[in-house]
From Swiss-Prot:
Role summary: Molecular chaperone. Has ATPase activity.
Assembly: Homodimer.
Encoding gene, per UniProt annotation: htpG
Location(s) in or outside the cell: Cytoplasm
Protein name, UniProt field: Chaperone protein HtpG
CDD domains (alphabetical): HATPase_Hsp90-like
Similarity comment text for this entry: Belongs to the heat shock protein 90 family.
Length: 636
């Protein structure tokens, strides 16, 4: 017998399972049945594509069996799927690879019911069995191999792994139930209820095996003689699920509850979906899709190793659930099924990535999903829930999917200078509100909505009744928005990198102002040195003394700078342009000041104050405070 230590995070997870997540213990059956179904899917695929397995499994049919023993306080879940060898058991149960227990632990909220719903999303569903088990034995034999193995654990820090004997391929999970759980889960009616609730539309039959006391039928003579029927114990073998490919059934026959139950069985989510999209397509390519959008974004949505939520079938035969190219990455939150009538069963991953049929299915699926999201957008309340969860990946779509760029832009929602806090606007609504002379969409990017709404750069736009989009998700908006270019011929313009809206000032008046302040502009630039690219007078301000802007070239470099930072590489920040308001009292007094020390202090205050107003960092907060103190003292 070989003893193995659990991966550190697994031990931590098992402790959580047994001590924290009490509220929804029944999900362990859902998780183990889903795993059994996946194992059968894999063997079903291999027997049709692997020459070494075709003959041996020609008559094979996948099924799942559940047995229980009230006296023994035990429960067994058995499948005849692909099975596991020694390496598989260590990789699948002894460690957690892709989804990461650390992320699971970090995502825990302290709400036991919510936390139990995270189990499946993080691919740690097997371990949920330790919520109800004193001990678990996993006996498995891999298809095409001779040796079977037994994995055993009490859910503490280690597990045993030993060779054993098993006649056929597949996996048996024997669960020795805790005393307090046996009454609930070693029960025919409870098991049937749980399977019907979570796994009714698993594609393979699920049989419940149990002993039942029955009375033998009496003959007419024995009945007349008053004899009592003899009782005996019969072994029952009852199918307890529908075992149908739900997506192939006509939509007219399916109820919302059918769709919701199936979603829960494939997504490991205990909530109903936000949106269900069921489509059968005929023509050049014939395929059926059943897509779901979850109410809550998948926990791994922003991980590079996110798990694809879409399964590919060919004529009801499972092919893969690990192909991220079935849908574009900006739709990685979508869950569901694609079932093709035209793809070959032995399609390889390389062929999948270049296959014309699959490319057509992908294109058609994307258009359908976007069209259904657009329908959802007509309900403002429901669409606000969608936007709260998925606006970021949708924005990625603008960058990734030129074909559907316009359709995606119609789905985007933005905060703006004319919307209340918590409300958002579409680009179409923005256009409709604009005055007849406006032919551009103006925006400002930053990290804090309140700071952006109070930015001095908005002053001239408010004065001219021009709406500005408030983009407070800088991490993505700084990259994506410049790439949009235009929406229905209206160009996107960053107000930090363009001239302000027209003001009632002739060229002659403008020139006169510049000449009047030429000397002080030169002095300010000299005092600030490399901290600024230039110093100018501006007409964009009505209340603030100064602001900072970028020139057009620097605005284009912002996205590149962000990408460099994301890769951990430094890229020097471009110095801003400082603009001062010639109508402001501070600037007027500064223009007539002869004290060089005061000019230097005020110059730096104008720059640092402008940067703070845009949510930017200032290089020397101590010096800023000292300058303010000196200027305040002089003013008293």
């Amino acid at each position: 017998m070989a003893k193995h230590q659990f991966q550190t995070e697994v031990g931590q997870l098992l402790h959580l399972m047994t001590h924290s997540l009490y509220s929804n213990k029944e999900i362990f059956i859902r998780e183990l049945v889903s795993n059994a179904s996946d194992a059968i899917d894999k063997l079903n695929y291999l027997r049709l594509t692997d020459e070494n397995l075709k003959d041996k499994y020609a008559q094979w049919k996948g099924e799942i069996n559940i047995s229980f023993d009230e006296k023994d306080k035990s429960l067994s879940i058995i499948d005849n799927g692909i099975g596991m060898n020694e390496a598989d058991l260590i990789a699948s149960i002894g460690t957690i690879a892709k989804s990461g227990t650390k992320s699971f632990v970090e995502a825990l909220t302290g709400d036991a019911k919510k936390d139990s719903n995270l189990i499946g999303q993080f691919g740690v569903g097997f371990y949920s069995v330790f919520m109800v088990a004193d001990k678990v034995d996993v006996i498995s034999k891999k298809a095409g191999e001779e040796q079977a193995y037994k994995w055993s654990s009490t859910g503490t820090g280690e597990f045993d792994l030993t060779p054993c004997t098993k006649e056929s391929n597949g996996t048996v999970i024997y669960i020795k139930l805790k005393d307090e759980e046996a009454g609930e889960f070693a029960s025919k009616y409870r098991i049937k209820n749980i399977v019907e609730k979570y796994s009714n539309h698993i594609a393979y039959p699920i049989f419940l095996n149990y002993d039942e006391e029955v009375s033998e039928a009496l003959s007419e003579e024995d009945e007349k003689a008053g004899k009592k029927p003899e009782k005996k114990i019969e072994r029952k073998h009852e199918q307890i699920n529908a075992a149908t490919a739900l997506w192939m059934q006509p939509k007219a026959k399916l109820k919302e509850q059918d769709y919701n139950d199936f979603y829960k069985s494939i997504s490991h989510d205990s909530s109903d979906p936000m949106l269900t999209i069921h489509t059968k397509t005929e023509g050049v390519n014939e395929y059926t899709t059943l897509f779901y959008i979850p109410k809550i974004a998948p926990m791994d949505m922003y991980r590079a190793d996110f798990q694809s939520g879409v399964k590919l079938y060919v004529k009801r035969v499972f092919i893969t659930d690990d192909e991220k190219e079935l849908l574009p990455t900006y739709l990685r939150f979508v869950r569901g099924i694609i079932d093709s009538e035209d793809l070959p069963l032995n399609v390889s991953r390389e062929i999948l990535q270049e296959n014309r049929i699959l490319a057509n299915i992908k294109q058609g699926s994307v258009k359908k999903i976007l069209a259904e999201i657009k329908k959802l957008s007509k309900d403002e309340e429901k669409y606000a829930e969608f936007v709260a969860q998925y606006i970021r990946p949708l924005k990625e779509g603008v960058y990734q999917d030129y074909t559907n760029k316009e359709a995606i832009l119609e789905l985007l929602r933005y905060k703006s200078s004319k919307t209340e806090a918590g409300k958002m606007t579409s680009l179409e609504a923005y256009k409709e509100r604009a005055n007849s002379e406006q032919k551009a969409i103006y925006y400002i990017v930053g990290e804090n909505e309140k700071v952006l709404r109070n930015s001095p750069l908005l002053e001239s736009y408010k004065k001219n009744d021009i709406e500005v989009l408030i983009l407070d998700d800088k991490e993505i908006d700084e990259i994506i928005t410049p790439a949009i270019g235009a929406f229905k011929e209206w160009e996107f313009k960053d107000i930090t990198a363009i001239e302000p809206p027209k003001v009632e000032q002739s060229e002659e008046e403008k020139k006169e102002v510049e000449e009047k302040f030429q000397d002080i502009l030169s002095k300010i630039k000299d005092k600030l040195g490399d901290a600024v690219k230039d110093v100018k007078v501006t007409s964009r301000l009505s209340e603030s003394p100064s602001c900072v802007v970028k020139d057009a070239a620097d605005a284009q470099m912002a996205a590149m700078a962000h990408m460099f930072r994301a890769m951990g590489q430094a890229m020097p920040e471009s110095a801003p342009i400082l603009e001062i308001n010639p109508e402001h009292e501070i600037v007027k007094k500064l223009n007539g000041c002869a004290d060089e020390a005061t000019i230097e202090d005020v110059s730096w205050i104008l720059l640092d104050q402008a940067k703070l107003s845009e949510g930017m960092e200032i290089t020397d907060t101590v010096a800023f405070a000292q300058r303010l103190s000196r200027i305040t003292a002089k003013a008293l």
